[in-house]
Curated annotation (Swiss-Prot):
The lineage of its organism: Bacteria, Pseudomonadati, Pseudomonadota, Alphaproteobacteria, Caulobacterales. It is a multi-pass membrane protein. It is found in: Cell inner membrane. Residues 232-485 form the CN hydrolase domain. Pathway: Protein modification; lipoprotein biosynthesis (N-acyl transfer). This is Apolipoprotein N-acyltransferase. The gene is lnt. InterPro entries: Apolipo_AcylTrfase (IPR004563), C-N_Hydrolase (IPR003010), C-N_Hydrolase_sf (IPR036526), LNT_N (IPR045378). One of its GO terms (molecular function) is N-acyltransferase activity. Its EC number is 2.3.1.269. The chain crosses the membrane at residues 19-39, 65-85, 96-116, 128-148, 169-189, 197-217. The keyword Signal does not apply. Belongs to the CN hydrolase family. Apolipoprotein N-acyltransferase subfamily.
Length: 530
């Protein structure tokens, strides 16, 4: 006890505890799954309430920012792995990328802490103000520039678990508000009757979260349709991919797996991941090329092939590039183009360079070895790949964004192709799978997910991986499955983030009532004794 008191007296104890609180909250996310880490949010709320009284704004901001550094540092450290693919050239950038990303994303938490402080809540119900401030800034994190909603607090719950099912009602942002309100409540439980009431409501809400989820998981989905799919994962490591001498070997790996004998009839759809082959789709699918013929030979007549890859339009030294999903059908002797989906949400500094002209002038583009930018595709829309089958493609990190694709009741499944090979055997790929699976819950539609090195999977409309329908990191093989059934149209599909906005409004009303109550108390005339 004495040691703890001495520690608390240190000027650096608050910042250190804030960093630890952020780390704890990050540990609650998959693949770690240490759910008691959610108490990190209660710790952060306590630290914000007990900021330095002499410099409160500065103290609050830095505590929020440091908690964010811990949260995003542990949550996105895997981004450094991408710079180690070509370590001799880019390895020196890895520590700067990891720390820079964590520090930049943590600014949203610093601003959220300032917003919480500005509202100056005093009652125990300030936990709702805390939830509203941080949930609002998390929404901003998902929308500023192109947005990066990686590991929203509401997506702490493993997709497919009971608590995750509430995303079908309120979406990932609404679930973020609810998660923060529940997790922050222990910070106020000692504050008299109001604190006990707030904590009791949080406990009841947690029970309700699990109860609603259990009911949702027990509801039957529509029967699986007759459409079958084969997902191909060739386990081509990123550092080998751009070796020109290995190109034929990579093609052979994909076509061999595609042609693997079926237990019954050939699948209706074959899916290759994003960037499956290290060349432009225009080039390797050009008429007469050996690659085109190899693909034709690997398919049965009538089969559909969905290939993730880059393509270009126009001639000359600077054509227009797109990151695309190309749908092809095998005819009797050749391939015919069925449709193309172009990625809409591009990765900053990975697929395009913000302020391109300026950064090119100062030499950053050359330093980072970025070639011509990809071009943004149109607003995401479903792709009809057969007369009876409409799918919604999501390329790579498009699967992070709640509500990115407009709901369409005729869509049968979501197709997520991604190249997670950049991130090796780290926490990045399993986290990406978890986040993508939330789109299944929100839309009540299954996801067919293909990656080069894992994790490929068939995910049902409740966010659960279909038993036996996944390939882990470093595995090579195919997934053969029927497309799972759908659920009923969800409130989130119908109304989007309306529920989230209502929750933010509740936070605002609580804060306003507390402040009005304070003002009224301060100006009310004091009763004189007669």
């Amino acid at each position: 006890m004495i040691a703890w008191t001495r520690f608390r007296e240190r000027p650096w104890s608050g910042p250190a505890l804030a960093l630890i609180a952020g780390l704890a909250a990050a540990l609650a996310h998959p693949p770690f799954g240490v759910l008691p880490g959610l108490l990190g949010y209660a710790g952060l709320l306590h630290l914000l309430d007990n900021a330095d009284v002499q410099r409160p704004l500065r103290s609050v901001f830095w505590r929020g920012w440091l908690a964010g550094v811990g949260y995003f540092g542990l949550g996105t450290w895997w981004v450094g792995e991408a710079f180690l693919v070509d370590a001799a050239t880019h390895g020196w950038m890895a520590p700067f990328a990891v720390t820079g990303m964590a520090a930049g994303l943590a600014l949203f938490w610093g601003l959220a802490a300032l917003l919480y402080r500005a509202l100056r809540p005093a009652s125990a119900w300030r936990v709702l103000t805390f939830a509203g401030a941080f949930a609002a800034l998390e929404w901003m994190r998902g929308h500023v520039l192109t947005g990066f909603p990686w590991n929203l607090p509401g997506e702490t719950w493993k997709a497919g678990s009971a608590p995750s099912q509430l995303a079908a009602l309120v979406g990932a942002y609404g679930l973020t508000w609810i998660t923060l309100a529940i997790a922050g409540a222990p910070a106020v439980w000692r504050q008299g009757r109001g604190g006990r009431a707030a904590t009791g409501l949080a406990v009841a809400s947690l029970i309700g979260l699990y109860g609603y989820g259990a009911i949702a998981l027990s509801r039957p989905l529509s029967p699986s349709g007759p459409t079958t799919v084969r997902i191909v994962q060739a386990d081509i490591k990123q550092d080998l991919k751009w070796d020109a001498e290995r190109f034929a070997q990579i093609v052979q790996a994909y076509v061999s797996l595609t042609a693997t004998p079926y237990a019954a009839k050939p699948a209706d759809i074959v899916i290759w991941p994003e960037g499956a082959l290290p060349a432009a789709v225009n080039d390797y699918l050009a008429p007469g090329t050996w690659v085109r013929q190899a693909i034709v030979d690997s398919l049965a007549p009538g089969q559909l092939l969905l290939i993730g890859g880059y393509r270009y339009e126009g001639a000359g030294p600077h054509p227009t590039y797109y990151n695309s999903l190309v749908a092809l059908r095998r005819t009797e002797t050749d391939l015919e183009l069925v449709g193309i989906y172009d990625k809409h949400r591009l990765v900053p500094f990975g697929e395009y360079l913000p302020a391109d002209r300026f950064l090119t002038v100062i030499g950053f583009k050359s330093l980072a070895r970025l070639s011509d930018n990809f071009t943004t595709g149109p607003t995401p829309a479903p792709l009809r790949i057969s007369p009876e089958l409409l799918v919604q493609p999501l390329i790579c990190y498009e699967s992070l964004f709640p509500g990115l694709a407009k709901p369409d009741p005729n869509v049968r499944a979501l197709i997520n192709v991604s190249n997670d090979a950049w991130f090796g055997v780290t926490s990045g790929p399993p986290q990406h799978l978890n986040l993508a699976s939330y789109r299944a819950i929100e839309s009540a539609k299954p996801i067919l997910r293909a990656t080069p090195t894992g994790i490929s999977a068939v995910v049902d409309a409740r966010g659960r991986i279909v038993p036996g329908a996944s390939l882990g990191l470093g595995e090579s093989g195919v997934i053969d499955a029927q497309i799972p059934g759908m659920g009923q149209v969800t409130p989130y599909d119908n109304f989007g983030d309306v529920a989230f906005l209502a929750l933010i409004l509740i936070s605002g009303v609580v804060s306003a009532r507390v402040r009005i109550g304070k003002i009224s108390s301060s100006i009310a005339p004091k009763r004189k004794l007669s």
